[in-house]
């Protein structure tokens, strides 16, 4: 007769859960010092759950917890559609491909809970059992739960690395008052490898599985203000997220799984044309990108990033659309458009200089004025040296 745990494992496979593990619900004391240190040093992104105690102690958010069930879903790393070679395109990081993974994980977790409730021997037992599902918007540090539940180990890039799927997995968990036999944690397998640390273009990784999230390109692409100039070139054409620390990891070599249809990327969504993004309406944005995890911050960060990506790709054909962005109501878009023109218009700067000078004559926002002045300086200095380019 299989145990309840064995039944859950079997059902998880039927539900399309790629990996499952069980751990106790004791406090994550090992996280306490590092979580406080991250906050004190200003390394947090601000997207984390703000109550540190609730991140460490499961009993703070769940009465009498006994176990935590951790699940992982593997996501694809390569698009099956062929990439068109036409206009300049941006890119969403792989964790934003397909339907928003939060919805997919919640669906699997709720179905798993429903199955467990069906296994109750009596109505009294069923009423006594309690569950609390959550994904990365909840209190827990998902990677710490998954590591303790035996799904994988936390790499130097701060991500959970599984034997089967590398780090290309979404994580979720269920806290319950049912006692399960815990699985064995997975020991760290990075060894002396530092490829993610040396590969990170901003030096965000601290070397011990933690990061300065403020320096992470993924974080920078999700902010709503002006992106600091140091990060703009390093962003390349990735308008949401950053996969570098995953792509360089030896555990991820050759990993590409297509288990879940709802995770499959569509080229026009995850490799969008950049120029049309600059003038996309709210309705069009919601229709094209609203179901992606990468749309959660709205269109402004993505439009700002599209202006940066066009400059990085040498998208001079988009200069007319970029000039139109100088009239945008949002200072971030006006300022970033000015910077983009300064990078792109060096060969034929006259039209851009005219637009930038007009912007200066009417602009009141200091950060926009500063960007416009820098762009004008670049274009006027390059104007005299075009023959040498």
UniProtKB/Swiss-Prot annotation:
Catalytic activity: epoxyqueuosine(34) in tRNA + AH2 = queuosine(34) in tRNA + A + H2O
A GO CC term attached to the entry: cytoplasm
One of the record's GO molecular function terms: metal ion binding
This protein's UniProt keywords: 4Fe-4S, Cytoplasm, Iron, Iron-sulfur, Metal-binding, Oxidoreductase, Queuosine biosynthesis, tRNA processing
Compartment(s) of residence: Cytoplasm
Predominant cellular place of this UniProt entry's protein: cytoplasm
Domain 4Fe-4S ferredoxin-type: 181-210
GO biological process, one term: queuosine biosynthetic process
Alphabetical list of Pfam families matching this protein: Fer4_16 (PF13484), HEAT_2 (PF13646), QueG_DUF1730 (PF08331)
Origin: domain of life: Bacteria
Gene3D superfamilies named among the record's database cross-references: Leucine-rich Repeat Variant
HEAT-like PBS-type repeats: 303-328
Residues noted as binding [4Fe-4S] cluster 2 in the record, renumbered to the chain: 200, 216, 242, 245
Keyword Membrane: no
EC number: 1.17.99.6
Cofactor or coenzyme needed: cob(II)alamin; [4Fe-4S] cluster
EC category: oxidoreductase
Active-site residue numbers: 136
Pathway(s): tRNA modification; tRNA-queuosine biosynthesis
Subunit text: Monomer.
NCBIfam families: tRNA epoxyqueuosine(34) reductase QueG
Sequence similarity: Belongs to the QueG family.
Function (record text): Catalyzes the conversion of epoxyqueuosine (oQ) to queuosine (Q), which is a hypermodified base found in the wobble positions of tRNA(Asp), tRNA(Asn), tRNA(His) and tRNA(Tyr).
PANTHER family given in the database record: EPOXYQUEUOSINE REDUCTASE
Name of the protein in question: Epoxyqueuosine reductase
Organism name: Enterococcus faecalis (strain ATCC 700802 / V583)
Gene name of this polypeptide: queG
């Amino acid at each position: 007769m299989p145990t309840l745990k064995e039944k859950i494992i079997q059902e998880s496979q039927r539900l399309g859960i790629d990996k499952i593990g069980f751990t106790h619900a004791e406090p994550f004391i090992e996280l306490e010092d590092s979580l406080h240190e991250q906050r004190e040093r200003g390394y947090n992104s601000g997207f984390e759950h703000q109550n540190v105690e609730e991140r460490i102690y499961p009993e703070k958010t769940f009465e009498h917890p006994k176990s935590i069930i951790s699940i992982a879903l593997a996501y694809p790393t390569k698009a099956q559609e062929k990439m068109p070679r036409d206009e300049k395109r941006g890119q969403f990081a792989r964790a934003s491909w397909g339907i928003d993974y939060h919805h997919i994980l919640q669906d699997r977790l709720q179905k798993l809970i429903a199955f467990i409730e069906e296994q109750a021997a009596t109505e009294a037992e069923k009423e006594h059992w309690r569950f609390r599902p959550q994904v990365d918007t909840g209190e827990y540090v998902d990677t710490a739960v998954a590591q303790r539940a035996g799904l994988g180990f936390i790499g130097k890039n701060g991500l959970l690395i599984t034997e089967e799927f590398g780090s290309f997995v979404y994580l979720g968990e269920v806290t319950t008052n049912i006692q399960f036999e815990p699985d064995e944690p997975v020991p760290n397998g990075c060894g002396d490898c530092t490829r993610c640390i040396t590969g990170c273009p901003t030096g965000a990784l601290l070397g011990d599985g933690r990061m300065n999230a403020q320096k992470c390109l993924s974080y920078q692409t999700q902010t709503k203000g002006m992106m600091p100039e140091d990060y703009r070139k390093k962003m390349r054409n990735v308008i949401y997220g950053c996969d570098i620390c995953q792509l360089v990891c030896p555990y991820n070599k050759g990993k590409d799984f297509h288990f879940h249809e709802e995770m499959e990327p569509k080229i026009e969504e995850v490799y969008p044309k950049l120029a049309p993004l600059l003038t996309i309406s709210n309705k069009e944005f919601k229709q094209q990108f609203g179901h992606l995890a990468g749309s959660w911050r709205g269109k402004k960060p993505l439009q700002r990033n599209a202006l940066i990506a066009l400059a990085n790709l040498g998208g001079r054909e988009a200069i007319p659309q970029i000039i139109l962005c100088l009239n945008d109501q949002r200072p971030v878009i006006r300022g970033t458009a000015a910077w983009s023109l300064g990078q792109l218009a060096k060969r034929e700067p006259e039209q851009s200089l005219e637009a930038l000078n007009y912007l200066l004559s009417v602009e009141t926002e200091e950060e926009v004025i500063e960007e416009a002045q820098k762009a004008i300086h670049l274009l006027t200095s390059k104007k005299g040296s075009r023959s040498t380019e």
